[in-house]
Structures are given as structure tokens and as C-alpha cells.
């Protein structure tokens, strides 16, 4: 009723599923799709892959895209968000996107790793 009455429809991200110990579960994108179908209104996504969110994060961290890496488990939100913000990207294969899925996308991450632990040796010493 609120959306049909003129309220703005804002959602955090378009991810249809999210990983869990029991397998993938419906996520924000699935709920947003349900509301869209019922109202005929598409949401404005404020989170990944929205470039405004990435720019705000870089500003908050006082970081630059040239020296920042986006690490994530989804090609369609995490990797594309990093690429659109001008960052190098790392796809971690412990989540939603699997190695066999990468070729379906017209873009590529800078690097693909099996686990976040594979990046530990790349960290600068503290």
C-alpha cells in the first residue's frame, strides 16, 4: 500500500540468494522481486553494485580506487561493483559464483581464488 501510495521503493541489493551452511537461501533481491511483481514498481538499489555506494565507501575510508581491491563471492554484484568503481577485483569461490559460472559474464575479475585464505600471503606486513 505504501509504494502504491507513492512511497519510494528502496532495497539494499539485487542478490536473489545468499549462501548459508544449509545451501543458498532467498535474499534481498528475491523479496524485492516479490514486491515489484505485486506493485509494478522497480526498486532503487542502494547497495552493491550501485557505484554511489562504492564511492561513498572509498570516501569514508579515505581510499582510492587505484589502491583498493574489491573482494567478493558474486560476479553480478561484488565484482561488477568493484570494476565500475575502477578497482581491481577478486572473486572468492566459497560463495554464490562458482568457477564454471564465470564465463557467463561479459567481464572478468582481476583474480579468482578458492578461498579468502589464499590472499593472506599477499597482505603487506603490519
PLM-predicted stretches and their roles:
Residues 1-126:
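Asp-based, Mg2+/Mn2+-dependent phosphohydrolase catalytic module
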Amino acid at each position: 500500500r505504501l509504494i502504491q501510495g507513492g512511497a519510494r521503493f528502496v532495497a539494499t541489493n539485487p542478490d536473489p540468494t545468499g549462501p548459508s551452511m544449509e545451501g543458498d537461501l532467498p535474499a534481498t533481491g528475491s523479496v524485492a522481486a516479490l514486491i515489484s511483481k505485486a506493485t509494478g514498481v522497480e526498486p532503487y538499489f542502494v547497495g552493491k553494485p550501485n557505484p554511489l555506494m562504492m564511492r561513498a565507501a572509498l570516501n569514508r575510508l579515505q581510499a582510492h580506487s587505484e589502491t583498493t581491491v574489491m573482494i567478493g563471492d558474486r560476479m553480478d554484484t561484488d565484482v561488477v561493483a568493484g570494476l565500475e568503481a575502477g578497482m581491481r577485483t577478486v572473486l572468492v569461490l566459497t560463495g554464490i559464483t562458482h568457477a564454471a559460472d564465470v564465463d557467463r559474464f561479459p567481464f572478468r575479475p582481476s583474480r579468482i581464488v578458492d578461498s579468502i585464505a589464499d590472499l593472506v600471503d599477499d597482505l603487506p606486513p603490519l
